Amino acid sequence: MRLVLASNNAKKLKELGTLLAPAGVELVTQGSLGIAEAEEPHHTFIENALAKARHAAAASGLPAIADDSGLCVDALGGQPGVQSAHYATLDPADIDGLAREALRERQDAANNRRLLSALDGQANRRARFVCTLVAIRSADDPEPLVALGRWEGELLTGLRGSGGFGYDPLLSIPALDATVAQLDAETKNRHSHRALAAEQMVALMRSAWHLA
């Protein structure tokens, strides 16, 4: 079954393509079909993921899948949540002309600084990465498949590890005795919030859509 991935992220395409392969699905990015990215105006992961999936399905005429992910911190009432990617505001003068990768690195660093500042002196460091996956057969599908993965951890007071991106150097996973940034790709993909959500989605596709 061919599905449009409501993202233009090549790494996400590769990762989800591998994780969802047991369901017999083939993913293509919306960008490869000339589809622009959808707006994400909502306050919850599920609403944003559903909006993105519907947008991709309506524009392509194909089934679609979307994810919305982020970091939720208990002491901050679940924030940064859906604003995780843009938690900190960058000065336009500091990012003018930056290449996409350099811009992401600048944003990641600013996000981490703001998070550490917000948690300064806070004893409760519990947090989790959350991934919500939504798959639909058509834009008006009344029965979207919804899968949710949570990866529990604790936020450190400083960065540790050089791998990954975003908040990976700050979130320590006690069960693995390492931050996400210290894990190799195989371990991360086996335990991550996205892997957990994808495992659920494969089961849902098999039972509800009778795939693979």
UniProtKB/Swiss-Prot annotation:
One of its GO terms (biological process) is nucleotide metabolic process. Pfam families: Ham1p_like. The lineage of its organism: Bacteria, Pseudomonadati, Pseudomonadota, Betaproteobacteria, Burkholderiales. Its EC number is 3.6.1.66. This is dITP/XTP pyrophosphatase. InterPro entries: dITP/XTP_pyrophosphatase, ITPase-like_fam, RdgB/HAM1. Keywords: Hydrolase, Magnesium, Metal-binding, Nucleotide metabolism, Nucleotide-binding. It comes from the Bacteria. Mg(2+) binds at residues 39, 68. Its cofactor is Mg(2+). It comes from Leptothrix cholodnii (strain ATCC 51168 / LMG 8142 / SP-6) (Leptothrix discophora (strain SP-6)).
